[in-house]
């Protein structure tokens, strides 16, 4: 049945994402590895795995890509509510609310905040740091997989190595700019999308290279990040007070 296929696809995506998130979490908890570098390296593994299965499932053979999946029957497709984007937006909105409640009002959210500030303090407070790290990254992996499921089952209905493009790196920027507040992330995301579309329009109007949009957006983000230094720290200029011998 159509509904059952959606449930199975979602469950498989969440399980795969949770396992993918568990790997760097285990190494972080066990040997204190750098989770940022670890996950960046795993990105290349994920891309090659995707490339492999694209060749295995390519349609037609030799095309090097997968066509629209179940285009005739639409089996496994998320139902359209108004248009292809409305239901994914509603799902993301619901997830945003749930994540805010989880981070702000649950015991797990409190533990994440304490461990993020200082693992040593968390240990003194009786929090099992290793368990928090693994649980948090497994949940993060599952949420990322949820986004991948929405992209494939709700919007693109196909699989490519560039289906998410650079959204993962953009998500890191959005999270940092939003101070990890789920609601502010929505505003930050809209800002980045507006900047990207505006820069693309400028590049198109002036007949510039397609990379110009990324360069312009990067420059703007650079200055936004630079201002964080002056927000966090107070710069004071002092005259040298050396005494003559």
Describe the predicted segments one by one.
Residues 1-19:
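Membrane-embedded helix boundary and interhelical linker motif in transport proteins
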Residues 81-158, 182-183:
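Helix-loop-helix "hairpin" substructures at the membrane interface of multi-pass membrane proteins
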Residues 28-30, 103, 177:
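Helix-capping/transition residues at the boundaries of transmembrane alpha-helices
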Residues 97, 124, 128-131, 199-245:
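Cytosolic-side transmembrane-helix boundaries in multi-pass membrane proteins
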Residues 13-19, 43-51, 88-101, 140-147, ...:
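Hydrophobic core segments of alpha-helical transmembrane domains in multi-pass membrane transport
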Residues 61-65, 109-114, 233-245:
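Short, Lys/Arg-enriched, Gly/Pro-containing loop segments at transmembrane-helix junctions
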Residues 35-105, 212, 244:
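Transmembrane helix-bundle core of multi-pass membrane transporters
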Residues 13, 138-144, 148-218:
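Transmembrane alpha-helical segments in multi-pass inner-membrane proteins
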